């Protein structure tokens, strides 16, 4: 089972989904795809709630970028797992979370106030430029690993267990292969 949301929800639908029962179990079995390996990180600028801007192509080093939304239940489940991953892999890869919420800081700031996610940035793309760069709107969550040159290594569509040892191995192995080192094992995500 693949747990995911689409980016096409209207504002009213987004608010309804955000109020969904949080006790609902989410299957964390995202799908790893290498179909877009080698593509450059999108030329998109995101903002944070304070108005700071970040051009994604200006980010240095390897990046694990997660496109999510507050109304996407699988995304919400993933956020604490990504926060833990960001802490564990600090200095190895930069974890960027980018919200696709249409209302931007109005809903993103309260989300971060509610959940303790000290290792995750609060980037937003309320115009959905990033989603459109991924061919008009991917399923959410979408997590893409980029190497130090800003080239895609792989992407995972749907919710994934970022707290697992295998998740850390997937990221580290992919980055070591990109750096020219031989991998120890084959990727375990299907």
Residue ranges and their predicted role:
Residues 6-7, 178-190:
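Non-globular targeting/processing and membrane-anchoring segments
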Residues 54-76:
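Short active-site neighborhood of thiol/selenol oxidoreductases, capturing the structured segment around
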Residues 62-63, 93, 141, 151:
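Alpha/beta-hydrolase fold active-site loops
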Residues 112-119, 124-176:
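Thiol/disulfide oxidoreductase modules built on the thioredoxin-like
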Residues 2-4:
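C-terminal motif of bacterial Sec signal peptides marking the signal peptidase cleavage site
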Residues 6-43:
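N-proximal helix/coil linker or "cap" segments that precede and/or mark the start of modular domains
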Residues 77-115, 126-133, 169, 184-189:
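Structural microenvironment flanking redox-active thiols in thiol-disulfide oxidoreductases
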